[in-house]
Amino acid sequence: MSIVGMRKFMQGKMQYVMLALAAVMAVGIVGIGIGSGRGGSVQDDSSGVMAKINGEKIERQDFETQYQNQTEQNQGNLPSAFEEAQARGRLFDSIVDQMIKVQAAEKAGVKVGRGEVKKKINEYINMRISQLKEQALANRKGKKTDEAFEAELKRSGMSLAQIKTDLRKAIDPKMVQDQLMIQKQMDKIKEGIDTSDRAVKASFDEIQLAQITVSSKTRPMAQAEQRAKDVLAKARSGESFAKLAGQFSEDAYSASGGDQGAFVRKSNLPEELASTLFGLKAGEVAGPIKQADGYVIYQVKDRRNALPADFNDPKKRKEYRDTYVQQEQAIVQAKAESDMRKNASIVVNDPEIKGYLITKNIGSYLGPDGGVRAKAKAKEAIKEFEKAINQSSGNSQALARCYSQISYLYYVMCKTGLLSPTPQEKIDFRKKGIDSVNQALKYTESNDLRTLLADLYIDDKNYDAALKELKYVSDNEFYDYNVHMQILGKYEQMKSARPEIVAQRIADEQKWIADYEQRMKEAQAAQEAQQAEQTTKPFKVNPGSGG
């Protein structure tokens, strides 16, 4: 068999396995195998501990191997260094969530037997085989028999027995056990939901609200709190809430006397706020309730029960009950998971992961201080990435990830007003951003990074350097329409600075965009023509498809 023939044979063989494994990955039951590890940790000590969750270790080698298993499912679609950093961070988050849930289940005394694990594994395998069979015989006329499915598999060099074997090997019984424990624990938590008619009817209770907002944007938070307390005292003493809103409120509702207008249900509000407000009678007030940018005082203007007219119809009542139960289960599960995470002891040792976690939560620090805390957190994240760089021992992938993330942080700090940089800080952040991108490009190639670099050069009025980066990206980006639209926009920014060069560059980009749009039209027409002539063909699965 020729090399080309062998490659085609292996592609045909693997497409079934890859498709089948995709669904297994989706439910998180593929085990940690032994692999070389593409990502590369920031530390050489592969036996080290990345983190401890309530005292339980996340071993570095286990993490790297699991990341390797994850990336193997995306062959041919390798991420950029920044995307890889995000993927590694998300994997860490998912591992932590899984560990916390399993620990909670163990603490609650949840048990799962071997028979339950074996049964669930067989269910997963049978489910995937059924889905594969349905796809394999989608264009077949007549009965979709097991024999016909086997014949289709044979044409691609596979057998049903082999697929089942490969699937079974890919499933880690311990992870199946963990999933079952988590499910049992959640089912146990949900058992406490009141599903009586009274509870279902109460879910249709609605309140109409008015509010007074005392902002901390123009005063310290402590002063905002005291002002809100003074206004609340006036409201409780009998003064008109609408007049107080018109006089003191600092939000869009002040013109309407604080009236929000529409009625809301308990499920439309955050749990704690809903519990407070739905415990009030019409005309009563509550507060002051702290928000990110001040304090809010609420008044329940009116109450009503919006029970549907057809509620007493048995069929409709069942539908309403089912919807209510689903909503309550989702709320209870979300709260349980939030409480588990909130009460967990999470100690992270890996500086790259530390930097990721800080960066991910920077938005939560935006508030009335003009972005001071958020900016401090961004700098803290940069320090962690720098620490990771120092510990990388020259690992090029780890260096590319860390420098990429530092680049984006400096870019955000100098390009957005959310973090309120001073004029000098903008200059400093821009220069550090340029340096960081250039460092990242020593270890990775990325059109996204080069486009970001060009943007920083434009702000720095280094137009020649910006033009060079944009030309490189344009010449090497063959498929992404949006990238060429970005390039066109950046050339427009430099029209007056380098008119003799930019005019031709704009024309080139416009031509690329027009040619691309024409190719897309032709491809669409060809696809429609092919679909019109579609006849029964051998089963072919896109390896990237999950089902």
Residue ranges and their predicted role:
Residues 1-89, 342-547:
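Short, low-structural-confidence N-terminal segments
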Residues 149, 153, 316, 321-322, ...:
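Extracytoplasmic/secretory soluble proteins
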Residues 68, 72, 96-113, 117, ...:
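Sec-exported extracytoplasmic/periplasmic mature domains
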